[in-house]
Amino acid sequence: MAHLFTLSELSVTEIIRLLEDAEQFRKGHFWRPPEPMFIANLFFEPSTRTKCSFEMAERKLGLHVIPFDADMSSVQKGETLYDTVRTLEAIGVNALVIRHSQDAYFEELRHTVRTPIINAGDGCGHHPTQSLLDLLTIRQEFGTFAGLTAAIIGDIRHSRVARSNAEVLTRLGAKVLFSSPEEWKDEANPYGTYVDIDTAVAEADVIMLLRIQHERHAEKMGLTKEQYHERYGLTIKRAKKMKANSIILHPAPVNRDVEIESSLVESERSRIFKQMENGVYVRMAVLKRAIEEGRMANGNYFEKWQVVQ
């Protein structure tokens, strides 16, 4: 399957292969298709890190990026996502990167669109490339996932990052802890155990802090930013309870002094900006997979890819 909608649809072997490819890109290996390839990034939600790192990855691979601005497209005239995607497929785009506010937007495209689609985030659903860059960061630090404890802290219910990470970390042999305000618990997520934040911080090898998803809340948060930070944030006091070799992750954007004390964002334990760096390598690996498997699915079985080292 050339599409990447969720990590749950990939085997552990496929996930590890993507991480290995990403690590090779980090070490300076390059891959180029033998002919021009065209990519369109369809972002229907605001994005800095995901959009820019996809564009960086595409340019590093020598791919041609087709500009797309949802606010200036026919979407504003009522065109559906399906028709937008089919239009780009018809004009010859080789792969599509899509972020959309609708959960599981890709289900209507799964069996009707042959062009590979990479999910860059669907509503409160999934964020596979964020999970992959988190996995790469953890793997670089610990060399394995088995036996690790990962604490996911914050707005669990509305976070696609929490959903994606909890599932894949469990499959890879890690223990997942959740900690959040009562109203933001996701009781439908079977992959973690809820504990209080102090227990989570003390037991975790990996502390994953989540941004408060204000744009997905039907009601305003019942706490002030200061109250949230005191009760559920990674404060200086809580950070002192961390294990000797534990690390801090955050998908960003970071609300400083809300989810995490500002001085901890670039502290010795933080890998937040390392995650962003790894995002480029992971997305290079994902794009390579999409184009290779997309061409195979379309009958180009005898094409050979050029690997430049």
Swiss-Prot record:
Pfam families in UniProt: OTCace, OTCace_N
UniProt keyword terms in alphabetical order = Pyrimidine biosynthesis, Transferase
Where does this protein have coiled-coil stretches?
none
**UniProt cross-references to InterPro entries, sorted A to Z:** Asp/Orn_carbamoyltranf_P-bd, Asp/Orn_carbamoylTrfase, Asp/Orn_carbamoylTrfase_sf, Asp_carbamoyltransf, Asp_carbamoyltransf_Asp/Orn-bd
What does the record give as its pathway? Pyrimidine metabolism; UMP biosynthesis via de novo pathway; (S)-dihydroorotate from bicarbonate: step 2/3
Amino acids binding L-aspartate? 77, 160, 211
The protein's name is Aspartate carbamoyltransferase catalytic subunit
What is the species of this protein? Geobacillus sp. (strain WCH70)
